[in-house]
């Protein structure tokens, strides 16, 4: 595996991890915030 391919795959994993983290935070906020919004 070439270094450029390795860094590309690493950036893909990093981006997926960040997207999942942001998604999890948004879901957590929407779940805990439901009472105040209704």
Curated annotation (Swiss-Prot):
InterPro entries noted in UniProt: PSII_PsbX (IPR009518), PSII_PsbX_type_1_subfam (IPR023431)
GO biological process terms on file: photosynthesis
Record's GO cellular component terms: chloroplast thylakoid membrane; photosystem II
Keywords: Chloroplast, Membrane, Photosynthesis, Photosystem II, Plastid, Thylakoid, Transmembrane, Transmembrane helix
Membrane topology value: Single-pass membrane protein
Pfam families reported for this sequence: PsbX
Entry-linked Gene3D superfamilies: Single helix bin
Transmembrane residue ranges: 9-29
Subcellular location: Plastid, Chloroplast thylakoid membrane
Residues forming coiled coils: none
Lineage: superkingdom: Eukaryota
Known partners and oligomeric status: PSII is composed of 1 copy each of membrane proteins PsbA, PsbB, PsbC, PsbD, PsbE, PsbF, PsbH, PsbI, PsbJ, PsbK, PsbL, PsbM, PsbT, PsbX, PsbY, PsbZ, Psb30/Ycf12, at least 3 peripheral proteins of the oxygen-evolving complex and a large number of cofactors. It forms dimeric complexes.
Role this protein plays: Involved in the binding and/or turnover of quinones at the Q(B) site of photosystem II (PSII). PSII is a light-driven water plastoquinone oxidoreductase, using light energy to abstract electrons from H(2)O, generating a proton gradient subsequently used for ATP formation.
Protein family: Belongs to the PsbX family. Type 1 subfamily.
The name this protein goes by in its record: Photosystem II reaction center protein X
UniProt source species: Phaeodactylum tricornutum (strain CCAP 1055/1)
Phylogenetic classification of the source organism: Eukaryota, Sar, Stramenopiles, Ochrophyta, Bacillariophyta
């Amino acid at each position: 595996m070439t270094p450029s391919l390795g860094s590309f795959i690493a950036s893909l994993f990093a981006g997926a991890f960040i997207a999942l983290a942001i998604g999890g935070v948004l879901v957590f906020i929407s779940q805990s915030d439901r009472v105040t919004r209704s």
